[in-house]
């Protein structure tokens, strides 16, 4: 894990040419607390940080320090009061330890509101989303898979490797809760878990809203 605070960032000028004006695959995991998406351009990231008062940005990928995406995001974070944490997941997957680490980071009230992202906002973000539900909300592997597989960009028929890793994570997982975390209604959480474990119809994910030009 790499933690980058304001003091750790190199000085620099404005943004490099690389930018994306809207965050793809933006979705709310916990209203007011956790949001996920694809790799954001610096303009869209700063809009999200301002709109949602993001305290912590968690990046779920290994990336070279001279990659234009890294350089642009570094400079964006430097302009904010947010903390940036990188968990170097490689390829389109993660180890179960990395899943637990990321889930604990975004679940910690001291880090919230938190935004986590990989590159495409799909496989690694789905794994961390599922890990959070299993480790911190008491979901079964089936229930967590039900949630992430219903996201519009998920492809349940071809995302089998993600499902296997979620099952592995659930088999090894020790549930965790933060003593100061009073943000959930226990009864509502229980009903929500039961709903997904039964495979009941779901109205769909909560969208994060547009952070484009408009």
Residues covered by each model-derived region:
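Cys-dependent protein tyrosine phosphatase-like superfamily
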Residues: 1-114, 127-214
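Substrate/cofactor-recognition hotspot
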Residues: 121
